[in-house]
Amino acid sequence: MKLIELLFILLPLLLWPLTFIVLNTIFIYAMLVSVIILAIISLRIYGREIKWSNNSIIKAITIGIIGALILYLLFYIGYYATILLGIQKGVSNVYTMIYGNAPTLILMPTLALIGICEEIYWRGALQVYVKKKSRFFKKIPWVAGAMYYGLIHLSTLNIVLFAAAVIVGIVTSIIAYKYGILSSIITHVVWIEAIVIFFPIGA
């Protein structure tokens, strides 16, 4: 395995604890830098192999918006599950960390860019890597991508954030695998803007 491929796979193991724990007071900016680094490496290694879209732009957008609506509904239901389980404080902690010192005018484009870069790495390049390197997950690379995305969020020490990552990972990974990451990017960006800026749940 080449050094750059090793870096490509292992870097989130460093960046996620650094972003969510060490630099949580400037979380949104640290997250932006982290995912930009991952996206640059992804495009450098697998940019030509990433499945961007296999549909018309209208269909890609439609699929992306439907995916965002599904995600938002799942999170709406999930919030009430956290209340029943008595862990809803984990939700407010996530919002507090996201809002931080970032004004809305900065937060909106920053969240969009984070969503784009995350999809390039987690649902784009990572699925390419899994298809090329894994025998077990070769035909279901979205499963490996969703698993890694969920598990990496255990490092945040927030069970709600871990559960949220599992849901986001599964939905966007399936969309990217079937329709391309243009649709999963739209899903991610529309959903995150809705749940953080326009229609927050449990903030």
List the model feature ranges, each with a label.
Residues 49-114:
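Juxtamembrane helix-loop-helix connectors linking adjacent transmembrane helices
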Residues 12-16, 37-38, 67-75, 191, ...:
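Alpha-helical transmembrane segments of multipass membrane proteins
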Residues 27-31, 89-97, 162-170:
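Non-cytosolic membrane-interface motifs at loop->transmembrane helix junctions
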Residues 4-9, 31-32, 56-64, 103-107, ...:
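Residue-level signature of transmembrane alpha-helical entry/exit and packing/kink sites
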